[in-house]
A protein has these predicted regions:
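A ligand-binding cleft/hinge motif common to bilobed small-molecule-binding domains
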Residues: 118, 122-127, 131-134, 267-282
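Structured C-terminal subdomain patch of bacterial secreted/periplasmic proteins
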Residues: 39-43, 147, 160, 258-260, ...
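Boundary at the C-terminal end of the N-terminal hydrophobic targeting segment
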Residues: 28-33
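Alpha-helical, coiled-coil/dimerization segments enriched in small aliphatic residues
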Residues: 68-77, 209-247
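Bacterial N-terminal signal peptides
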Residues: 14-25
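Basic- and aromatic-lined ligand-binding clefts that recognize polyanionic substrates
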Residues: 42-58, 169-229
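N-terminal secretory signal peptides that target proteins for export/translocation
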Residues: 1-8
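A short, structured surface patch at a secondary-structure boundary
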Residues: 49-124
Length: 326
C-alpha cells in the first residue's frame, strides 16, 4: 500500500512539474527577449534574417525587411517597428511586386541583401539574392553582406554599410567572449543521450494545440545535439503516412513516446502547447511516468535555433548545454 501511494505521489509530482515548468520558462523567456535600446530605423530594405539580426545588434533596423519569421524569434517582436514583407521565398514566388512596390511607396532606393552558402537547410534553392532580377531597371542600389567568410566578416561588412564601423569591434568581442564561454561549458565527452524534440503551437482563439516532431539532420542536430554528443530519435516516431515539412512532421498523440523511451524531452516553439499535451496524455496514460525522461524530470523548454539569431547562438547553445548535461 505504501509503495502504491508513493507511486501515485511521484506521478502527481511529475504532472505538477510539467505544468509549472512551462509557465516559468515562458515568463523567463519573455523577460530575456526585451532589447536594451530602441534601434534606429533607416531608409533601407534588408533581405535575410542573419543580416537583420546583426543590424539589430548594431542598433539599426530597416524600414522594411524580408526574413524567415518562423525561424527568427525576434521577428514577432519587431512587427510594430518595421514592415515585414514576407520570407525571401514569398517575395519572389508569391508576391513578386512587394519589394519594388514597398520601395516606391516609401521612397527607398537602397536594398541590402544577405548572401549565405547555406541560407536554409529546409529550402536549399531559396536565396535572398533571388529577388535581384525583379529589381532590375527600378533605380535601386543593391548591396550585399557575404557570410561565406564567417560571422566576424559579416559583422564588419554590415557595420560599414550601416555607418556603424565604430561598433563592430565591440559586437565581435562580445560574441567571441560569449562563444568561448559556451564552448568551455560543453561536456568533455559525448553525453550519448536519446532526445525527442517536440515543437508546439497554441491556438489562443480555440485553445487547441498542434505538435510537431523535429526530424534528425536539421538545425537542432547540427547546432545543438552534435556538439553535445546526443542523438535525435524523433524519426522513430514517424509513421509512413506522415509528411515531413521544414524538418518536422505532425503528431497528435504523445503516447507513442513509450515506443522510443527518450532520455530527454525537449519542448520548442510554444512550450505551453507541448506541456498541455503532455499533461493530458499522462492523465490518460499514467504509465508514461515510467519513461526515462519523465521519470528523471528531464523535460526542458528550450529556444529553437534555426541559424537566424546568429548573435544569440552562444547563449542558446549554453541553455541547451545546461539542460542536456543536467
Amino acid at each position: 500500500m505504501t509503495q502504491y501511494i508513493k507511486k501515485i505521489n511521484l506521478k502527481a509530482l511529475i504532472f505538477s512539474f510539467i505544468l509549472i515548468t512551462g509557465f516559468l520558462l515562458l515568463s523567463s523567456q519573455a523577460t530575456e527577449a526585451k532589447p536594451k535600446k530602441t534601434p534606429k530605423r533607416i531608409k533601407v530594405i534588408m533581405i535575410g534574417d542573419r543580416l537583420v539580426d546583426i543590424a539589430f545588434n548594431l542598433g539599426v533596423l530597416p524600414e522594411a525587411m524580408s526574413v524567415r519569421c518562423s525561424m527568427w524569434p525576434m521577428c514577432e517582436k519587431l512587427l510594430s517597428a518595421t514592415q515585414i514583407m514576407g520570407c525571401p521565398k514569398c517575395i519572389v514566388d508569391r508576391i513578386p511586386n512587394i519589394v519594388p512596390d514597398t520601395a516606391k511607396k516609401r521612397g527607398i532606393k537602397r536594398i541590402i541583401i544577405e548572401k549565405h552558402p547555406n541560407f536554409c537547410f529546409y529550402k536549399p534553392k531559396v536565396k535572398p539574392a533571388n529577388i535581384v532580377p525583379l529589381l532590375e531597371g527600378k533605380g535601386m542600389t543593391i548591396e550585399y553582406v557575404d557570410f561565406a567568410n564567417g560571422l566576424e566578416s559579416a559583422i564588419r561588412q554590415t557595420a560599414e554599410l550601416l555607418g556603424r564601423k565604430s561598433k563592430a569591434d565591440a559586437l565581435i568581442n562580445r560574441y567571441n567572449k560569449a562563444m568561448a564561454k559556451a564552448k568551455d561549458a560543453l561536456p568533455k565527452e559525448k553525453l550519448g543521450k536519446k532526445v525527442v524534440i517536440i515543437n508546439g503551437t497554441y491556438q489562443r482563439a480555440t485553445g487547441k494545440t498542434f505538435l510537431r516532431i523535429e526530424m534528425p539532420g536539421g538545425y537542432s542536430d547540427h547546432f545543438m545535439l552534435k556538439p553535445l554528443g546526443c542523438k535525435n530519435i524523433g524519426d522513430a516516431l514517424k509513421s509512413k503516412n506522415k509528411k515531413v515539412n521544414k524538418g518536422h512532421f505532425p503528431i497528435r498523440k504523445l503516447s507513442v513516446l513509450s515506443k522510443v523511451n527518450p532520455d530527454i524531452i525537449i519542448m520548442t516553439g510554444n512550450i505551453f502547447a507541448v506541456q498541455k499535451a503532455l499533461a493530458i496524455e499522462m492523465k490518460k496514460n499514467p504509465a508514461l511516468a515510467d519513461l526515462p525522461a519523465i521519470k528523471a524530470l528531464a523535460i526542458y523548454g528550450l529556444p529553437f535555433y534555426g541559424d537566424s539569431s546568429v548573435m544569440e547562438y552562444p547563449s542558446i547553445l549554453r541553455q541547451w548545454t545546461d539542460a542536456l548535461s543536467n
